[in-house]
Amino acid sequence: MPHLLEGDFFHSLELFQILEKTPGITPFMAVATLENKVVGQMLVILYQRKSLFPPYLYTHAHAYGEGLYAPDAEQNAIFPLLLRSLTIHLHKRLCFYIEFSRMSKKMLGYREFRKLGYVPIAWQEIHNSLHSKLPQERLSDKQIAMIKRMKKKGISCREATSPEDIHRYHQLLKNYYRLKLRRFVPDETFFQKLSTSSNARNVIITYKDKVIGGYTCIYNQGNAFLWFSAFKRKTYIHLHPDTMTIWQALSDAQEQDAQHLHFMDAGLPLKSNLYREFILGFGGKPVTKFRWFRFYPKVINLLLHWLYKD
């Protein structure tokens, strides 16, 4: 493999190596070179999925962002080549659907995606600014009082670095996402490998040594990205584990000097979304961008084109 570019964890050699050691996941990296130098690279993650409904076994590919490019590279010329290469490769592998999210600009790559049969779906993303105000300055007096009250009750947090803590956190994630069919929780190996990276933190929220919440945050390009989060909201409703988990993620991001905390998944693009409304309560800013989807069965793409005419 040629000497790859550095600067975006989601398209890095480090993440590629973590993913290739994780059962149930296959990473693919498209690389563009010019005069034996890498000028662009794009990482896509292929997940092996199971479903109670047809298709019972399928694969789903996800790319986070448009890739990474050399400072002097012609991104507008290289991006279509990388996108086409990965799309053709995944199509040959009968990948059920491909998804691109976290695009830096709403209209970036619009023409290229359309040419390859992708469908744009308007998706609301949320981020909290940490550089202009402290996180607590965006909270209501009621929220601040509640957080102080929960801390007095004994709720604490720590980074999950030991195998035991990571196992308990992984069990929490699996139970939390069990009925959320669109979300995929990687094998425990993934979180073990992430815990050794300087770009990632797995954090657990505890009460009397019981894990009631947790999250995985990626620190990348001066920002924080909340990749996974889970909490036992119903079991410990009196302890508000959902609020304590999101609040801790915001506090940690601010301590790490992140400019923003981005929620990588604020829920489905429905008019009424309780989770989205919940995280907006922490002072976040909603921004509508496109997520791009391409399904292997052409009939699904045709249906989506009809439903999401832009």
List the predicted regions and their residue ranges:
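A conserved beta-strand-loop-helix scaffold within acyl/acetyltransferase catalytic domains
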Residues: 1-51, 102-127, 134-238
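Aromatic (often tryptophan-rich) hydrophobic motifs at membrane interfaces
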Residues: 31, 62-72, 80-88, 196-298
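Active-site/acyl-donor-binding loops of N-acyltransferases
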Residues: 29, 41-42, 46-47, 113-135, ...
